[in-house]
Structures are given as structure tokens and as C-alpha cells.
């Protein structure tokens, strides 16, 4: 968080036109991410524990790319600033994992657990829901609900496997 903010401040100090999009819980059908990991784990395991006390909003990379494209294509990049983007709605990692498992057609028993059961050097916020009001007002965009976007991603993963 601190290094990201320092980077944003450096860009702002330069004095150029800029658009910064903050996001969270990013996933797609490419690379390593929570969705792909959970699909694999819930296919391979009978039981799994996932934290329920960290709340946020997943972000489908395709939706983020679409918003950025529309802003640039619509010649709106002069509206410089820092904007938040994630899909609509909120969930815990546990809720997200359960939905991934169900949409993938897996039957793993997913149990909720506390974050402190998974010690980490990186401190994770318990509530990381982004306020997208500024983005919506500036660019007049509608943002898809996280479950709808997850369905699209899972379907693309199924098609490519």
C-alpha cells in the first residue's frame, strides 16, 4: 500500500496528465490468481479452509480493461485523477471461493476460518471495498456485479481447458 501510494504521488508531482486506476482482488483466465487457484484446489481436495474475515470486491481484469479502453476511446483521459475500480457488490474470500467452487462444478467442502489461522508477513486489511462513486460520476459507466463477471471468467476457463 505505501509503495503504491508513493508511486501515485510521484506521478502527481511530475505535473503530467494522468489517470490512475486502483483495483483489488484482480483475476482473469490468465496468470496466477485466486480464481484459478481455487478452481484447482476445489477440484483436487475434499475439504478446504478459506478466510471469511477479509471483505472486498473481486475485479475481473477484462472489466477493468474495458473501462480503461472506454475512457481512452471516449477521449475522456483529460479527467485526470485517481479512480477506484472493482466489480459491484462485496464478499469475503470464503464467499468468493464457494462461488468459484460451485460455478466450476466441484464438490469440495469449503469451511470458513479466521485470517490469524494463516500467519503472513504481509498485513492484509479486513475491509478493502473500493468506493467507485468518483469513477461512475466522471465517466458515466455501469460496473458489472462480481458474480456475473465471475461466471464469464469461469466459462472462458472451461472453454479453454
Regions picked out by a protein language model, each given a short descriptive name:
Residues 3:
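Active-site helix of classical SDR
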Residues 9-56, 62-63, 69-70:
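NAD(P)-dependent short-chain dehydrogenase/reductase
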Residues 117-136:
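A hydrophobic C-terminal alpha-helical subdomain
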Residues 63, 69, 77-81, 158:
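Catalytic phosphate/metal-binding cores of nucleic-acid and nucleotide-processing enzymes, i.e., regions
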Residues 29-30, 54-65, 85-103, 152:
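Substrate-binding strand-loop-helix patch
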Amino acid at each position: 500500500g505505501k509503495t503504491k501510494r508513493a508511486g501515485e504521488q510521484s506521478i502527481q508531482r511530475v505535473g503530467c496528465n494522468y489517470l490512475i486506476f486502483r483495483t483489488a482482488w484482480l483475476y482473469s483466465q490468465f496468470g496466477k490468481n485466486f480464481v484459478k487457484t481455487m478452481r484447482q484446489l476445489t477440484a483436487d481436495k475434499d475439504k478446504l479452509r478459506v478466510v471469511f474475515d477479509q471483505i472486498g470486491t473481486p475485479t475481473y481484469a477484462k472489466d477493468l480493461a474495458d473501462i480503461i479502453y472506454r475512457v481512452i476511446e471516449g477521449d475522456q483521459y483529460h479527467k485526470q485523477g485517481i479512480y477506484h475500480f472493482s466489480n459491484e457488490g462485496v464478499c469475503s474470500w470464503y464467499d468468493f471461493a464457494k462461488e468459484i467452487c460451485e460455478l466450476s462444478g466441484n464438490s469440495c467442502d469449503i469451511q470458513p476460518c479466521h485470517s490469524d489461522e494463516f500467519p503472513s508477513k504481509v498485513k492484509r486489511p479486513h475491509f478493502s471495498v473500493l468506493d467507485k462513486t468518483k469513477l461512475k460520476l466522471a465517466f458515466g459507466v455501469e460496473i458489472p456485479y462480481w458474480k456475473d463477471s465471475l461466471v464469464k471468467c469461469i466459462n472462458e476457463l472451461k472453454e479453454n481447458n
